[in-house]
């Protein structure tokens, strides 16, 4: 499938409320990724907008997680990987040698599929990033920890046990702690790779509610296998298949009136 075949929504298909001009946060132009001889991503062209939740859906092995790892250059940690094309974060080429990867990963946070708190106290988990960036004042750290835990909807549950080991939290609490840890360095974008797949339904609902609150300040890009989740929480959705973007558009329209038969078949559960 050629790049030009990716389905684009016509303006008349999108409600006027969705046509408000928004700042582009990320642009991907002609991105190709290979693992050795395996062509994992093929000619990806996508743009993401500020203060929106964008969902990336598709069957296992379609390239979703590979793609999200390119956005903060974690892909470079994988042996024998090769990239071609361009990714711009707020107009700046992220693979440019003048752009320190540490700076990019401060601006673009990442929350993984499995909660991965450090084997430290709840407080030290959240304070870790600010300390790395040179903040030592205890009062300032206290403020950051409380603010981040409040933003992650966790403060009331842990405020009396901040110095207990974070590994003693439930799975859902650990994932919200990881979100708080991400927020503590004040990122611009939050990447989430299957953030609720290991959680129970109640914890999943809390994280989804949290994402809705966070998008008033942050841009969120989430990879999910859960189509119902994508439909519930996202503003836009990209459907990946075999390393290609098949369709990308406003979520309500993509789910109710998909323009490509492969999208319709996937949403209907005919494969995947």
Curated annotation (Swiss-Prot):
ATP-binding in keyword set: yes
InterPro entries: AAA+_ATPase, ABC_transporter-like_ATP-bd, ABC_transporter-like_CS, P-loop_NTPase, PstB-like
Catalytic reactions on record: phosphate(out) + ATP + H2O = ADP + 2 phosphate(in) + H(+)
Membrane topology: Peripheral membrane protein
Binding site for ATP: 58-65
Broad EC category: translocase
GO MF annotation: an example: ATPase-coupled phosphate ion transmembrane transporter activity
Localisation: Cell membrane
GO cellular component: plasma membrane
Main location: membrane
Keywords, comma-separated and alphabetical: ATP-binding, Cell membrane, Membrane, Nucleotide-binding, Phosphate transport, Translocase, Transport
Ranges for domain ABC transporter: 20-267
EC numbers for this chain: 7.3.2.1
Gene Ontology biological process terms from the UniProt entry: phosphate ion transmembrane transport
Subunit structure: The complex is composed of two ATP-binding proteins (PstB), two transmembrane proteins (PstC and PstA) and a solute-binding protein (PstS).
PANTHER family assigned to the protein according to its UniProt record, in alphabetical order: ABC TRANSPORTER I FAMILY MEMBER 17
Function recorded in the entry: Part of the ABC transporter complex PstSACB involved in phosphate import. Responsible for energy coupling to the transport system.
Family the UniProt entry places it in: Belongs to the ABC transporter superfamily. Phosphate importer (TC 3.A.1.7) family.
Identification of the protein by name: Phosphate import ATP-binding protein PstB
